[in-house]
């Protein structure tokens, strides 16, 4: 009897862990993505100017996932899993993403058979002009071209 209880308990714990992991990834996937409006934005511990600053972002157009809202505040998560609260006046609808693949190539057209025009390192911020099923047309620095959509964090789905 004790062995059956242990097996049942183990099975229940395993089930809830799997469901919890799956639902967290789905929640992020279906959330709205915005970007930072200014070169310097404060991430706060809670939804008010009374809460302490947790982190200072210093990158305009950094994409963030909106997790929750409270009045004029949005709870966000960035590509490094930092989370906290930002006032809505500091958020923009400008579409941007972060390159998550080492030495990604930007192509002149939306095919790997077109001319490569630049190579991106991990963590590079790109502005999204438009996306197709597998590709996004992006701008970064002096380069405009196409990159594989699955290399980007913060892309339009």
Locate predicted features:
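SH3-family beta-barrel domains
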Residues: 23-45, 55-60, 67-109, 115-133, ...
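Second-shell loop/turn segments in exported
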Residues: 47-51
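N-terminal signal peptide c-region/cleavage motif recognized by signal peptidases
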Residues: 18-22
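Bacterial N-terminal signal peptides that target proteins for export
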Residues: 2-10
């Amino acid at each position: 009897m004790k062995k059956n209880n242990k097996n049942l308990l183990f099975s229940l714990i395993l089930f809830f862990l799997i469901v919890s992991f799956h639902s967290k990834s789905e929640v992020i996937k279906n959330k709205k993505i915005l970007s930072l409006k200014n070169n310097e934005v404060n991430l706060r511990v809670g939804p008010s100017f009374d809460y302490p600053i947790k982190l200072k972002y210093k990158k305009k157009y950094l994409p963030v996932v909106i997790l929750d809202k409270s009045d004029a505040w949005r709870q966000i998560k960035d590509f490094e899993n930092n989370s906290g609260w930002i006032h809505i006046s500091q958020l923009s609808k400008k579409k941007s993403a972060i390159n998550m693949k080492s030495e990604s190539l930007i192509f002149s057209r939306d095919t790997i058979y077109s001319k490569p025009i630049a190579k991106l390192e991990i963590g590079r911020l790109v502005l999204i002009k438009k996306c197709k099923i597998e590709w996004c047309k992006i701008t970064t620095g002096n380069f405009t071209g196409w990159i594989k959509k699955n290399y980007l964090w913060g892309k339009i789905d």
